[in-house]
């Protein structure tokens, strides 16, 4: 399953922030939650994230885990992973003013598409972590319960 506050889609769990942070702060916050800024690998994942963001009903924009901070125009996911799937808004990325280097999921005319944006600007963000297969998480919980039970019996 997924930790409290995370939402499941296939093998991943996603957390949609209610707070706004710069790109770097958002990445740090996701690490604190033992996750990373969301990486969108395919259309299915994109549809889930866009659908969930839309259902939240807030016209928020969200940081995703990619930038072209290293080489202008070379967009990579966190961990230097190449982008095999993209869903840029028409005319994006445009590096407006020469200072847009971080990937934002932007609500435009009621639809969520990708946009490059200034990394230091505050935005909402989406964290992603791998889902723990249910059997393992249940087993871990039972182990914790058993060791807790054993500790209590020793007292």
UniProtKB/Swiss-Prot annotation:
PROSITE patterns reported in the protein's UniProt record: C_TYPE_LECTIN_1 (PS00615), C_TYPE_LECTIN_2 (PS50041)
Start and end residues of each C-type lectin domain: 9-128
Membrane-crossing segments per the record: none
InterPro entries: C-type_lectin-like, C-type_lectin-like/link_sf, C-type_lectin/snaclec_domain, C-type_lectin_CS, CTDL_fold
Single Gene Ontology MF annotation: carbohydrate binding
Post-translational modification, as annotated: Glycosylated.
Disulphide connectivity of cysteines: 2-13, 30-127, 102-119
Sequence repeats: 136-145, 146-155
Protein name: Perlucin
Keywords assigned: Disulfide bond, Glycoprotein, Lectin, Repeat
Glycosylation sites recorded in the entry for this protein: 84
Signal sequence bounds: none
Purpose of the protein: May promote nucleation and/or growth of calcium carbonate crystals. Binds to D-galactose and D-mannose/D-glucose.
Superkingdom of this protein's organism: Eukaryota
